[in-house]
Swiss-Prot record:
It is found in: Cytoplasm. One of its GO terms (biological process) is fructose metabolic process. Keywords: Carbohydrate metabolism, Cytoplasm, Lyase, Schiff base. It catalyses: beta-D-fructose 6-phosphate = dihydroxyacetone + D-glyceraldehyde 3-phosphate. Belongs to the transaldolase family. Type 3A subfamily. Homodecamer. NCBIfam families: fsa_talC_mipB, PRK12653.1. CDD domains: Transaldolase_FSA. One of its GO terms (molecular function) is fructose 6-phosphate aldolase activity. HAMAP family: F6P_aldolase. This is Fructose-6-phosphate aldolase 1. The lineage of its organism: Bacteria, Pseudomonadati, Pseudomonadota, Gammaproteobacteria, Enterobacterales. The keyword Lyase applies. One of its GO terms (cellular component) is cytoplasm.
Length: 220
């Protein structure tokens, strides 16, 4: 299983990389724009925040296949082993095929259906990113889409992985993992929710209180 953070917040990545067994960091144009740092600045900073390890993902902005390929080359000039995110449009599928031929790893993004995701994998995408919560918001089932896509990739494109994205709750993320999803990327608020349990804090406080009462200290 691979766990990613979906953010461009360098400080948060550095802090959470101490805690989480991170495989890397994913970004998209909206995330980069919110951070107000250009790619050539923030991508190296994110790489350094992870101790020079882990995979980074960044997305193309062009809408034609040729433009997407040029964007991918620019991204690879910033971070040599970056995974290039390509929206799974008709032009995006063509770009994924072209990038596969160049040996540039890709992630098919903006996936709203299992068939769409399968096509990106067959075109050569190493990862496929279904938008779980956004599918739910449109009246579909994000978890069912992940389940179907996982089965399709297992049967027809076994070298590709589902990297589920767009979560609002830890439950959605866990349900994806239970469905067999190999990778997930979490926004910071959902990542924090996964390790924030008030009952745990209360239990630890009670342990300390009892130990202090018996031995006059809180150390062993």
């Amino acid at each position: 299983m691979e766990l990613y953070l979906d953010t461009s917040d360098v400080v948060a990545v550095k802090a959470l990389s101490r805690i989480f067994p991170l495989a890397g960091v994913t970004t998209n144009p909206s995330i980069i724009a919110a951070g107000k740092k250009p790619l050539e600045v923030v991508l190296p900073e994110l790489h350094e925040a992870m101790g020079g390890q882990g995979r980074l993902f960044a997305q193309v902005m062009a809408t034609t296949a040729e433009g997407m390929v040029n964007d991918a080359r620019k991204l690879r000039s910033i971070i040599a082993d970056i995974v290039v995110k390509v929206p799974v449009t008709t032009e995006g599928l063509a770009a994924i095929k072209m990038l596969k031929a160049e040996g540039i790893p890709t992630l098919g993004t903006a996936v709203y259906g299992a068939a769409q995701g399968l096509l990106s994998a067959l075109a050569g995408a190493e990862y496929v990113a279904p938008y779980v919560n956004r599918i739910d918001a449109q009246g579909g089932s994000g978890i069912q889409t992940v389940t179907d896509l996982h089965q399709l990739l297992k049967m027809h494109a076994p070298r590709a992985k589902v990297l589920a994205a767009s979560f609002k709750t830890p439950r959605q993320a866990l349900d994806c993992l239970l469905a067999g999803c190999e990778s997930i990327t979490l926004p910071l608020d959902v990542a924090q929710q996964m390790i924030s349990y008030p009952a745990v804090d209360a239990a630890v406080a009670k342990f300390e209180q009892d130990w202090q009462g018996a031995f006059g200290r809180t150390s062993i």
